[in-house]
Curated annotation (Swiss-Prot):
Keywords: Ribonucleoprotein, Ribosomal protein, RNA-binding, rRNA-binding. It comes from Xanthomonas oryzae pv. oryzae (strain KACC10331 / KXO85). It holds the Pfam family Ribosomal_L22. One of its GO terms (biological process) is translation. InterPro entries: Ribosomal_uL22 (IPR001063), Ribosomal_uL22_bac/chlpt-type (IPR005727), Ribosomal_uL22_bac/org-type (IPR047867), Ribosomal_uL22_CS (IPR018260), Ribosomal_uL22_sf (IPR036394). Belongs to the universal ribosomal protein uL22 family. PROSITE patterns: RIBOSOMAL_L22 (PS00464). This protein binds specifically to 23S rRNA; its binding is stimulated by other ribosomal proteins, e.g. L4, L17, and L20. It is important during the early stages of 50S assembly. It makes multiple contacts with different domains of the 23S rRNA in the assembled 50S subunit and ribosome. Part of the 50S ribosomal subunit. This is Large ribosomal subunit protein uL22.
Length: 113
């Protein structure tokens, strides 16, 4: 059985479309390189994804005794979470609904073979 560790961040306050831009850059990289890339990105999603990747690395290290240098980001998924519905006043007494989207971010790290 291959060694894998998983970490999930649920209901992150960022739209899935914006989070996927960052997730696509990290997918398939070594864990150390992924964290380094995310550390120097100025996007909001990079900070959130970095925390999830670091959590997955810690899970692999603590729960399965994995060597951090051999880990790579096998899977990273950004799914749509529940939307927060907000109301914005418009002209002539009308209103428009605003959807503040959230994301579920899942990261799976495993041994690079």
């Amino acid at each position: 059985m291959t060694m894998e560790a998983k970490a999930i961040l649920r209901t992150a306050r960022i739209s899935p479309q914006k989070a996927r831009l960052v997730a696509d850059q990290v997918r398939g990289l070594s864990a150390e390189r992924a964290v380094n890339l995310l550390k120097f990105s100025d996007k909001k999603a990079a900070h959130l994804i970095k925390k999830v990747v670091e959590s997955a690395i810690a899970n692999a290290e603590n729960n399965q005794g994995a060597d951090v240098d051999e880990l790579k980001v096998k899977t990273i998924m950004v799914d749509e979470g529940p939307s927060l519905k907000r109301f914005m006043a418009r002209a002539k007494g009308r209103g428009t609904r605003i959807l503040k989207r959230t994301s579920h971010i899942t990261v799976i790290v495993g041994a690079a073979k």
